[in-house]
A protein has these predicted regions:
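A mid-sequence, solvent-exposed acidic-amphipathic segment
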Residues: 239-277
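Active-site-proximal loop/hinge segments that shape catalytic or ion-binding/gating pockets
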Residues: 329-337
Length: 338
């Protein structure tokens, strides 16, 4: 099998990637936090930089349901941010699950749910700003937060475009929690999805440029958040977003997201456990063999982040026949288990 070399490209500047606790209680009366999910490190490095610049704690969505909430019932709302990658032009399954079942644990008890939207309201909710298609940021304005209302932002990482992901996220927060999203951004990062024909990791020159541009944009985003700018929609939605998110995405979920297709080549695998440590959902275990190294086994709780594939130092992991001969990528400075 032809294998491309394992590459760790230079990450963000040295100021980025400072370690932050996954769950850190804030002593400020205005509760602030950034919820994030990351597979290969693209979203994590963005979330860490925003947390450092904004002095906010990070909360990992993949494991936050196991940690006690730390939002006091009478706390004033501050900044609530979300950083995660776009998977198949939508939210990763783990993010959808968090928003539906666990985000409420972090909300003040006085937070009420929004009433169900009328048909006309639903139509407006599914509309995107006309600037979205051309990737031109809409005008932003400064706003002083009212008591109890958080400033909510979404920063998406993606290899190219987002499809209707911002709309799906916006509607979920509005319908379940009555929260309004004040600002949206998308940040292009090196491509990691390689599980279908024609998809591979970016060339090194392309990946380096994306990382450099992403570092600059992340700093700009932090400044906009510090000013509490609202009405921001700086997102590359891409062409045919409805087709991608509403037709292609269900097909991806039905036929291209099963962990049953993962396989480890026993002639190459050394049982080093890097795949186990890299899985954000603890979905991989090692199965012992007689007279052979233990090999990974995948459970059913998979969000198709491909961290296991990209983290294997021996390129022993494949997903069906679609990943044969393709490259690997993981953000430099992100350790196994981060």
């Amino acid at each position: 099998m032809r294998r491309k070399g394992f590459r760790r490209l230079p990450g963000f500047p040295a100021s980025i990637g400072i370690a932050h606790p996954r769950h850190t209680a804030s002593t400020d009366s205005r509760q602030t936090m950034i919820f994030y999910f990351s597979g290969t490190g693209n979203s994590l490095v963005v979330a860490r930089e925003l947390a450092k610049r904004l002095n906010e704690p990070l909360v990992e969505m993949a494991s936050s349901h196991t940690a006690p909430p730390y939002v006091s019932p009478d706390a004033q709302a501050g900044v609530v941010g979300f950083v995660f990658p776009v998977y198949a032009w939508g939210m990763p399954h783990v993010v959808e699950d968090f928003l539906k079942h666990y985000f409420r644990l972090f909300m003040p008890k006085t937070q009420t749910h929004a009433p169900a939207a009328s048909p006309s309201q639903s139509a407006r909710q599914n509309a995107l700003p006309s600037a979205a298609e051309t990737h031109k940021p809409t005008a932003a304005r400064s706003q002083t937060l009212s008591h109890g209302k958080p400033y909510v932002f979404l920063a998406l990482t993606c290899g190219d475009d987002t499809g209707k992901t911002p709309v799906s996220f916006k509607n979920t927060l509005k319908e379940r929690y009555g929260l309004h999203v004040d600002a949206f951004w998308s940040i292009q990062m090196p491509n990691t999805y390689i599980s279908i024909p024609g998809f591979d990791v970016d060339k090194e020159s392309v990946a380096k440029k994306k990382i450099g541009d992403a570092a600059l944009k992340t700093a700009h985003i932090a400044r906009q958040i510090q000013k509490r700018q609202t009405g921001v929609f700086d997102v590359k939605v891409g062409k045919f977003p409805n087709i991608k998110s509403h037709i292609l995405r269900p097909l991806f979920n039905a036929f291209l997201s099963s962990p049953k297709r993962f396989h480890a080549d026993v002639s190459v695998c050394t049982g080093c456990k890097r795949c186990v440590k890299s899985c954000p959902l603890a979905n991989i275990s090692l199965q012992k063999h007689t007279n052979a190294p233990a090999t990974p086994q995948w459970g059913a709780n998979c969000t198709m982040c491909l961290a296991c594939y990209h983290s294997c130092p021996h390129h022993a992991i494949s997903w069906g026949a679609f990943t044969k001969g393709k490259g690997q990528y993981r953000m430099k400075g992100i350790e196994q288990g981060d």
